[in-house]
From Swiss-Prot:
Cellular component per GO, a single term: intracellular membrane-bounded organelle
Alphabetized GO MF terms: clathrin adaptor activity
Gene3D superfamilies registered for this protein in UniProt: 3.30.450.60
Organism: Dictyostelium discoideum (Social amoeba)
Location of this chain's protein in the cell: Cell membrane; Membrane, Coated pit
Protein name: AP-2 complex subunit sigma
Length: 142
């Protein structure tokens, strides 16, 4: 199960976060800061999986953004990496070469995409084509 999703830039600013497990605001900020310190300091030759407290962080870097997912230690890490990649592919197809500013200024659309891909901390829709069709439908609503 996915506990939370964080999208952070290299400077540590959280550009987007989605929490599937309830945390206090102070704890959310602390987790975001700790995770950024961990993933930002790792070399590219290391694996994209990190043990973190009682969970596991699976992350992937795209350009200047870190996409981090906190999962149970029993979850399949490669599946999580592919879920992150699917999410980024959908963002890229939807926005056309997505960048950090797209996430900042169109955050409500990014949250809609997250809600189409993930439901209650689980991958809901594995088809990029279906997700993009749903987003097109939402865009055409009056």
């Amino acid at each position: 199960m996915i506990h939370f999703i964080l999208i952070q830039n290299r400077q540590g600013k959280t550009r987007l976060s989605k929490w599937y497990t309830p945390y206090e605001d102070v704890e959310k900020r602390k987790l975001s800061h700790e995770i950024h310190k961990i993933v930002n300091s790792r070399e590219t030759k290391f694996t994209n999986f990190v043990e973190f407290r009682t969970h596991r962080i699976v992350y992937r870097r795209y350009a200047g953004l870190f996409f981090s997912v906190c999962v149970d230690p029993t979850d399949n890490e490669l599946f999580c990496l592919e879920a992150i990649h699917l999410f980024v592919e959908v963002l890229d197809a939807y926005f056309g070469n997505v960048c950090e500013l797209d996430l900042v200024f169109n955050f409500y659309k990014v949250y809609a995409i997250i809600d189409e891909v993930f439901l209650a901390g689980e991958l809901m829709e594995p088809s990029k084509h279906v997700i993009l069709q749903r987003m097109e439908f939402l865009d055409n609503l009056p």
